[in-house]
A protein has these predicted regions:
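Short, solvent-exposed loop/turn segments at secondary-structure junctions
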Residues: 32, 65-66
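Short, surface-exposed charged micro-motifs
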Residues: 15, 44-46, 55
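Short structural boundary motif marking the start of a folded domain
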Residues: 1-6, 21
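C-terminal boundary/linker segments immediately following FHA domains
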Residues: 18, 25, 60, 66-117
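Short, solvent-exposed loop/edge segments of extracellular or virion-exposed proteins
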Residues: 8-11
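Short, charged beta-strand/loop "edge" motif centered at a coil->beta-strand transition
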Residues: 22-50
């Protein structure tokens, strides 16, 4: 079963999968997701499909915060990445340069889903 990573920012949906294996996020207008926030770096983070995993790669000055959620929407423990990588699972939020608990213009929603054929 193939998986897809769905990212939602400002009601726009972006997908990372075998056909689109990478996506760049940041404040600069050359990113796939242009994050409109002073907390975000110009080139902030990248999501890559690697084998059967999705990896978040922080490339920022202020770090990327990851706030996972379980199926019922309960939030887990927030993780701060600084020039690090994290294998993603389930669903949750990314905070670009600021805590993801404060949803706003710096926040991107993520969720892993099984592809339907």
């Amino acid at each position: 079963m193939q998986m897809t990573l769905k990212l939602i920012y400002r009601a726009n949906i972006f997908v990372v999968n075998r056909d689109h294996p990478a996506l760049q996020m940041g404040r600069g207008d050359n990113n796939d997701i242009m994050v409109v926030s002073l907390f975000a770096s110009r080139v902030h983070a990248r999501v890559e499909a690697r084998d059967d995993k999705f990896v978040l790669v922080d490339q920022s000055s202020n770090g990327t915060f990851v706030l996972p959620e379980d199926e019922s929407g309960m939030q887990g423990t927030e993780i701060r990445l600084r020039e690090e990588e994290l294998v993603l699972s389930g669903r949750g939020w990314f905070g670009m340069g600021r805590s993801a608990t404060k949803h706003g213009d710096h926040s991107v929603r993520y969720m892993l889903e099984a592809e339907t054929t």
